[in-house]
Amino acid sequence: METIAIRNIVELVSINKKAKEHLAKIKSEFVLTFEELYILVYVYKGERDCYNVKDIVKQSKFKPYYISKAIQSLKDKGLIAKKRNEKDERTVAIQVSKAQHKKIKNLLMDIEAEIL
């Protein structure tokens, strides 16, 4: 995700307040946590069919537990699939089909239309 420059403390507080309002609306209307939303945006921007969960944890700086929980929820919603590496069972990857990519794109567009 890109870095946004914040010029002063007033701007920081204003942005934070607005972000919290948007995230609360996303959580209530679209039933998505911030971690789930982060993963969906990560997948949408990546446009690949397979993602290593360790890379998402490293990029997001979220605790692995929260990412695992979010991935399971997204899997339950049919937005992604999970698979384990055949050579190393400890390694988990996210797989995203073309149909799932389309669902993710449409969901993110719906969220943008509702929020922005």
Segments predicted by a language model, with ranges:
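Short alpha-helical linear motifs
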Residues: 59-65, 76-81
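N-terminal helix-turn-helix DNA-binding core of bacterial DNA-binding proteins
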Residues: 21-63
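Charged, amphipathic alpha-helical coiled-coil/dimerization segments
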Residues: 72-116
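Surface-exposed, interaction-prone regions with an acidic/low-complexity signature
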Residues: 1-4, 10, 34, 64, ...
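N-terminal leader segment of winged-helix/HTH proteins
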Residues: 1-30, 77-79, 87, 95
